[in-house]
Each structure stands twice: as C-alpha cells, then as structure tokens.
UniProtKB/Swiss-Prot annotation:
<feature type="region of interest" description="Disordered">
    <location>
        <begin position="1"/>
        <end position="48"/>
    </location>
</feature>
<comment type="similarity">
    <text>Belongs to the Niban family.</text>
</comment>
<dbReference type="InterPro" id="IPR001849">
    <property type="entry name" value="PH_domain"/>
</dbReference>
<dbReference type="InterPro" id="IPR026088">
    <property type="entry name" value="Niban-like"/>
</dbReference>
<protein>
    <recommendedName>
        <fullName>Protein Niban 3</fullName>
    </recommendedName>
</protein>
<dbReference type="InterPro" id="IPR011993">
    <property type="entry name" value="PH-like_dom_sf"/>
</dbReference>
Length: 697
C-alpha cells in the first residue's frame, strides 16, 4: 500500500448482504441475488471517499508532471524530422461508435431471482441497457438497468461460468443451503451470455437461438473492446500523460508489471487502481462475515464489490471533473511556455541523458544480457505472428471485397446489386461478423505470449489483444477509405462497365500495395511498442535498488532549466527505453530483414496504439475528404433519389468515413437522419442506377 493509505474497514455491516433478500440498486435490476438498499453504511462510504481523496492527492502531482512532459514530446515531434516512410493509405481518422444492437433476451433477475424476458439494447457508445419489453424502449421509457461494458468478460459456457463463480468463494463449496439459488443456475441454459467483472455484479442473459447468441456475442465483444481502449487509442497529450502518470504512480507504490488496469475511461482506470490495491484487505475483512454458502456467498460478494466499485467510481469521477479546469489551464500555459524554449529544453535533456547513459551502462547492459536477451527472440516472433496473421486476414477480406465490386460491375448493369456491394464494402471495417476472422487471429497467440511475458510481470494480454484487433480494424478502415477515394477519381460517365471494372482492378492493385506498406509499418510499431510494455517495467524494477540512487546528483542540472517538462526520473526512463528499443530493433531486423527500422528518440517514446493522426475522440465522424464525385456520377444517380443516401452511407461507412465533402457534391445533400433501416429497404426496390452496357451486353 502507498503512503497515507489505510485498509478499508468494511467488515461491519456485511451480514446484511444476503442473496434472495432485500432490494437491488435503484435503476438496476440486474443482480441475480438481492441486497439491501445500501450494503455500505455511512461510515464505510465516508471512508471510501477518504481513500479516493488520498489516491487523487498522490496521483495528480504525477499527472501534472506528465502533462508537461507530453506537451514537450508533442512539440518536439512537430518540429523534428518526419519518418522517411509514412502511411501510404488515406487515414480514416476517427473510428465509429459500435453498431447499435438490440433484441429480446431473458435475464436472471428479480427478488427472488428468476429468468424473465427483457428487451436489450447495446448503445453506440458501448453501454448496455435492458427494458421490460420492446414497446417500453420504443416509447422512450426508463430502462430496468444499464451498465458500461468496460472490464467485463463474456462467457457463453454455463459450465465455465459456474467454475468461475465457485472460485470466488472456494472455502464454502459443498456447504449448500436452501437460500442458495443453485437450481436456477444449474438448470441448463441453451444459449447463455454471462458477463463477468472482477469488481462488479455479474449479468446473466440467455438468447432464444444459437444465431441470436452469436450475434449478441459479437456485439457485446465489440462494445467491451470499444470502451476498453478509448484512452490508448487517443493521441491527445492529456490521454498519453494520464496513462504515463498511472504507470508512474503504480511504480511508486511498488507495482512494476504491466496489466489491464488501464482499460476504460480515466475515472474507470483510477477506480480499478484503487480496487486492486484494496481487494486483498477487503476480501479478508468481509468474506467471513457474508451469509450464505457456495454460490450464494459468491453472489453476495459480487454485490458488495459492486457497491464499493460504485462509490469509488463516483468519487474518482468527481475528483477528475474538479481537476478539469486546472488541467485545461495548465495545458494552455505549458504550450505557451514550452514552445519558445523547446530547443534549450531538448539540448539540456540530451546532455543529462548522455551522462546518465554513461553512469548506468554497466548494470543496464548486464541486466539486458542476463534477463532480456534470452527471451527477446521468442517474444518478438510471437508478437509478429499475432499481428501478422491478423493483418493478413484483413488483406484477404479487403481483396475479396474489391473483387466482388469489380465482378458485380461487369455482371449487373442495372446497379441494384452493385449498390448493395458498394454499401457492404464500405461497411466492412464495422461488420463484426466479417472482421471476426481477423479478430480471432489476434487471439490465437494469447496463451503462448502470456507464458513468455508472465516472468517479466506482464499481465496485460487483454490490452494487447485489443490493440491488435483495433489495429486490424483501423487498417481495414484506411484501405476501404483509400479505395473509395481512388475510385471517385478514376471513374467517369464515359466508361462502359468493362472499362470501369478494369479501372477498379488497377485501383485494387494500388490499394493492396499501399496496404502492404502500411501493414509492415504497423507491424513494426506494434512489436516495438508491446515489446517495451513487456520488458521496460521489468528492467526498471531490476535497476531500481542501485541505479536510481544516482539520480539526485543530476537534479541540479534539470532544475536549472526551470521547466516541469524535464525530470531526472523521466530522462532516466527514456535512456533505458532507448537501449531496450535498440535491442528490439536488432531482433526485428533479424526477423523481418527490415533495414529501415529506426531507433529515433521519438520512436522510443511511442506507445503501442500510437499512430499519426489517430483520433482522440472515437465518437466523432471522420474528416476524411471525399475527393471528386466522379464515382457517384458514373453510377448515374438522380440528384434526389433515395439511392443517393445509400451511396453516401457506403462511402461514409455507416456515417463514419467522411464529413468534409465538396459543396457541389450532390450525392451527400440527403440528410443522414433518414435512418439506416429505411435506406436498406429502398435498395431492393430502387431501379435507377443504369449503366452504359458493353456491346456484348
């Protein structure tokens, strides 16, 4: 435990948490077991608020320092040399919200709990809501319950879920009572959907058919991934600073291993940090006092955890909201003060880094040779297999999609079926069923890589897999956007179908070449970034006792600069990061034969998801420009046809590809508010899109 931190005295009052009695949380009827209106008494809630205040008091100084360092990093990158090999594909800068999914399910809920029909909705922001029936949802009624999907794990095996539940309270297995709702859980559920969270109550759903279960599984997994990596995907200085501050704060508490604690929003991350710190003491104090046995006690435990989590999350959210004005003012001030002095700051940083590198070279090289070098080749190769297989699956799907368009253009001059193909092609990055092939490839090496990384304290496999999956989706989105842009530029109304198909085939070749270049660059970034995540905390922990003792003698040089953007600890970590990255690059050259693998300082500072121009906000429409309207003119759409909206949607890829179109592009004048379902209905009935047939046609 860190300084000023006390154990949470929550043992008193936990006798009241009894499965099958009491009431659930207001507005959330999701728990299988019941609980009193508040499992925590006033004193316990006050104590938790004190714990959150202590966390913020210790964390915010780290955050302020990292904000300054992040602004310096951003300015130096803007002013420094650019990468010789940049992205070839056009950037689809902002990924969309998850597709909304809705339908009937049954849920284990109520007091006493029983399986009851509900109407469930996965919102575009990844939030899950459930209603008493469909009409309640359609009429804008209040939901029975809702939850953000951050941190949940989805299980579709009832046996696996029961084993997980039993593991929560293993000491009480076999002690069954009439209170325990085992009969409800052990009645076979044909198509279950169990959502489990380490600090929150579990959600038990069941679908009516295997097809419905499969569709919900894909949708829920997409929502979990979307909400989990919102910070990692952002390139805003504040997001990068926050993640670095969390890592430094935990290192100061003695935790050096990387794990999945940084999944979620900033408030959710801080909540997870505090919950992990307090969980052992909380478990020791409260479990003996919980009534019930077996799974009844396990459910009571999740109820209590949920109450603690809610209290901590509320406090963390309030604290970060209160800090927001100061953060905005600090960022503006840092920009004004750092930019004029950036050259001086970087020169001083380089001088201190050179001296530090000389001082720690001996123990650092010894640690790398002894601990890192023997495992590095296997880690790099496994990381490469993980991302390479996923991106190869993306390439295959992309090529098939472009081939279908060319084939349809040759075979269907009426345009109705072609219009469907254009729409489907634009939707590929967000088609969960289609992209599942790529996502599965990212999962295949999880076990092997986890075994290799665990000795170094790395437990963030879920974050790593999410990163590979997100990379696959981003590259697919970029490639689709590029193809549609180039098609816009090369097609004219003077072409017949065969000529147009030939031009699309040439575009296909160009896009695949660009994709090959970008996927190679993305693989190297992925391996370098995650290699650092695996090895850097371990090396820092190994050097902690000796090398950090040398840092105070450099404080004078750093303080003389008079900027909080430079700290001896930050420069020290950058030196170690740079040496590690040299090792990783050498191994990459052996594995890939990549002569252009660079080891610039900017590269050393990169994190796994960092990509040029990546969007800080996942829920905004992309700013990808439309280019010319020749593609749409070639398809001969009347200006006010409902099919115009279809093409707009296909190029937008569910309203997420582009928004900054030419003002005279008539295709995009139709308001997107018409709705996706209406547009799909007009596809099959609209017969306009006529083409000039070739002579043989």
């Amino acid at each position: 435990m860190g300084p000023d931190r006390k154990e949470v005295p929550l043992s008193r009052g936990t006798q009241a948490v009894v499965v099958g009695k009491g009431r659930g949380a207001p507005g959330d009827d999701s728990s299988m077991g019941g609980r009193p209106s508040s499992p925590l008494d006033k004193q316990q809630r006050q104590h938790l608020r004190g714990q959150v205040d202590t966390l913020l008091r210790n964390f915010l100084p780290c955050y302020r320092g990292q904000l300054a360092a992040s602004v310096l990093r951003q300015i130096s990158r803007e002013l420094g040399p650019q990468e010789p090999t940049g992205s070839q594909l056009l950037r689809s800068k902002k990924l969309p919200r998850v597709r909304e999914h809705r339908g009937p399910l049954t849920q284990l809920r109520g007091h006493p709990p029983r399986w009851q029909p509900i109407f469930c909705v996965l919102r575009g922001d990844g939030r899950l809501e459930w209603f008493s029936h469909k009409e309640e949802y359609e009429n804008g009624g209040h939901c029975l319950g809702s939850t953000a999907l951050t941190g949940y794990t989805l299980l579709t095996s009832q046996r696996e879920y029961l084993r997980l539940l039993d593991a929560l309270c293993p000491e009480s297995l076999g002690d069954h009572t009439q209170e325990e709702p085992d009969s409800l859980l052990e009645v076979p559920v044909s198509f279950p959907l169990f959502l489990q969270h380490p600090f929150r109550r579990h959600l038990c759903f069941s679908a009516a058919t295997r097809e419905a279960q499969h569709a919900w599984r894909l949708a829920l997994q997409g929502g979990i991934r979307l909400q989990g990596i919102v910070l990692q995907r952002s390139q805003a200085p504040a997001a990068r600073a926050f993640l670095d501050a969390v890592r430094l704060y935990r290192q100061h508490q003695g935790h050096f291993g990387d794990d999945d604690v940084t999944l979620g929003s900033d408030a959710e991350v801080l909540t997870a940090v505090l919950m992990r710190e307090q969980l052992p003491a909380l478990r020791a104090q409260t479990l003996p006092g919980l009534r019930g046995a077996g799974r009844a006690r396990a459910w009571a435990w999740t109820e209590l955890l949920d109450a603690v989590h809610a209290a901590v999350l509320a406090g963390a959210s309030a604290g970060l909201c209160a800090f927001q004005p100061e953060k905005d003012e600090l960022l503006a001030s840092l920009e004004k003060t750092i930019r004029p002095d950036v050259d001086q700051l970087l020169r001083q940083r380089a001088r201190v880094a050179g001296r530090l590198r000389t001082d720690i070279r001996g123990p650092l090289e010894s640690c790398l040779r002894r601990e890192v070098d023997p495992q590095l080749p296997r880690v790099v190769q496994t990381l490469l297999r993980t991302v390479e297989a996923s991106l190869e699956a993306v390439r295959t799907l992309l090529a098939q999609g472009m081939d279908r368009l060319s084939h349809r253009l040759r075979q269907s001059p009426s345009g109705t079926r072609l219009r469907r193909e254009v729409y489907s092609f634009g939707e590929m990055p967000w088609d969960l069923a289609l992209m599942q092939t790529c996502y599965r490839e990212a999962e295949r090496s999880r076990g092997r890589l986890g075994q290799l990384a665990a000795p170094f304290g790395f437990l963030g496999m879920q974050s790593l897999v999410f990163g590979a999956q997100d990379l696959a989706q981003q590259l697919m989105a970029d490639a689709v956007a590029t193809f549609l842009q180039l098609a816009d530029q090369c097609l004219t109304t003077a072409l017949n179908c065969d000529q147009a198909a030939q031009r699309l085939e040439r575009v296909r070749g160009r896009v695949l070449k660009k994709f090959k270049s970008d996927s190679g660059l993305a693989q190297r970034r992925f391996i370098r970034g995650w290699g650092l995540c695996i090895f850097l905390p371990f090396v820092l922990s190994q050097l902690e006792p000796g090398c950090k003792k040398e840092l105070p003698e450099f404080e004078g040089d750093v303080l003389a600069v008079g900027s909080q953007a430079l700290t001896t600890e930050g420069i020290y970590e950058d030196v170690i990061r740079g040496c590690l990255l040299q090792r990783i690059d050498q191994e990459l050259k052996k594995t890939l034969g990549a002569n252009d693998v660079s080891c610039t300082l900017d590269g050393c500072l990169e994190v796994p998801w960092e990509q040029e121009g990546a969007a800080p906000n996942l829920n905004l429409v992309s700013s990808f420009l439309a280019g010319r309207q020749a593609f749409t003119d070639f398809l001969c759409l009347p200006a006010k046809s409902s099919a115009n909206w279809i093409l707009a949607a296909s190029l937008l890829s569910c309203s997420c590809f582009r928004s900054g179109f030419h003002r005279d592009s008539r295709v995009f004048l139709v308001q997107l508010a018409e709705g996706l379902s209406h547009s799909l209905e007009t596809v099959s009935s609209h017969s306009v899109w006529s083409f000039r047939p070739t002579p043989r046609q």
